[in-house]
Amino acid sequence: MGKARTSASGLIKRDTNPAPALRSETAEKILDVAERLIQTRGCSAFSYQDIADALKIKKASIHYHFESKTDLVIAVIDRYSERFDEALKNITRDESATSMAMLERYVEPYAAFAATPDRVCLCGALSGEMPALPRAARERVAFFFKSHQQWLTQILKRGAARGDFNLAESAAKIARLFFGALQGALLIQRTTGDSSQLKDVISALKSQLRK
């Protein structure tokens, strides 16, 4: 991994090469299907044939855009992480927003995942397969988790300083609890089919911050 730097959203980011040229429509569709398959089945449980069947294209077309499955998975993770990072930048850009409002916007993607019972966070899904993932993928998944916990820490500190939150523990510890609870709630909902799981977890977390 490259040297870390701080982004505008308060996350630590890797130094990367200049962004690649825009992908073709076919490449984006391949990434869309691969992302959905990872979120619903897991990385090891899908193949290029599954994507080819879904898009009604030949496997050779997929290999043209992504030579190996590792290349594809890395591209999926990078695109997913970039979208999240842009969302976090948009949240922190509004300095007039309360810290609770920022957290409520943060959990919106999780609520969207929960609306599709068999779907979880991409990096949450991949974390269950860490030993089998290529090193580059493992590093990216770990980075996603760490950077989101750091972002949450900064929002919690902001809320405590402004009197929005009453933290019983350090902001860093609460951030770990918050992030872990969201990820865990999605996995438990998928396992049990309990559609209230995430909603109840978010409600409890918000109540703890207001005490």
Residue ranges of predicted features:
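A general structural signal for well-ordered alpha-helical segments in protein cores
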Residues: 48, 69, 73, 103, ...
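Amphipathic alpha-helical packing segments from all-alpha helical-bundle domains
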Residues: 85, 100-101, 135-161, 173
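Conserved hydrophobic residue
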Residues: 43-44, 165, 195
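Helix-turn-helix
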Residues: 2, 26-29, 33-71, 75
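Amphipathic C-terminal alpha-helical segment
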Residues: 113-116, 154, 158, 178-196, ...
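N-terminal intrinsically disordered/low-complexity leader segments
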Residues: 1-25
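Amphipathic alpha-helical segments used for helix-helix packing
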Residues: 101-102, 114-136
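Hydrophobic alpha-helical connector segments
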Residues: 75, 79, 89-119, 171-178
